[in-house]
Design a protein with these regions (language model features):
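Bacterial N-terminal signal peptides that target proteins for export
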Residues: 1-9
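Alpha-helical segments in soluble extracytoplasmic regions
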Residues: 29-119, 129-163
Length: 164
């Protein structure tokens, strides 16, 4: 009986070790993660360039209808950015970077929220509030970049030019 118990314990321990190493092999490396998310970010960057075409001119226009159109463009860009963020969240993350990436996703959510508020302010014709929201978008983008700088993103790196 004692020999059988030892064999069972040894077998269980070996299976746990194998399961642990198999799980570790499933975790992508940081470079593999970047390779998986960059195409998503690239598609979103290109979509936002199309959505936000001429938005700066419209937002600074004296015509209220042009300002409202700019607001609609920012709201649409916010929705596209949110969809891209959701896609990014589904990509398997390296276990070592999980906490950092969760903070990055939180920062990206704030960018999305601020883009939406910027669009709402422009649609309401409140240019001063819109200017404040634009600064908040830039600050949130910088915060997201500060969290994700170790990944050396290209398309996932946010800049003011992404949203103007």
């Amino acid at each position: 009986m004692r020999g059988t118990l030892r064999i069972a314990v040894f077998t269980a321990a070996a299976m746990l070790l194998l399961a642990g190493s198999a799980r570790a092999d499933d975790d992508p490396t940081r470079a593999e993660y970047v390779e998986q998310v960059e195409p998503i970010c690239q598609a979103n960057t290109e979509a936002n360039q199309r959505i936000l075409k001429n938005v700066k001119t419209k937002a600074r226009s004296k015509s209220p209808s042009q300002v409202r159109k700019a607001g609609s463009q920012f709201i649409q860009a916010s929705a596209a950015f949110g969809a891209a963020t959701q896609k990014l969240a589904t990509v398997p993350r390296p276990a070592a970077d999980d906490t950092r990436l969760l903070r990055w996703f939180k920062s990206l959510g704030i960018v999305k929220e601020k883009l939406f508020k910027l669009g709402k302010a422009l649609k309401a014709g409140e240019k001063i509030l819109a200017a404040h929201e634009q600064v908040r978008v830039e600050r949130a983008s910088n915060a997201a970049n500060n969290v994700g700088f170790v990944f050396e993103f290209h398309y996932c790196h946010l800049s003011a030019s992404n949203f103007t």
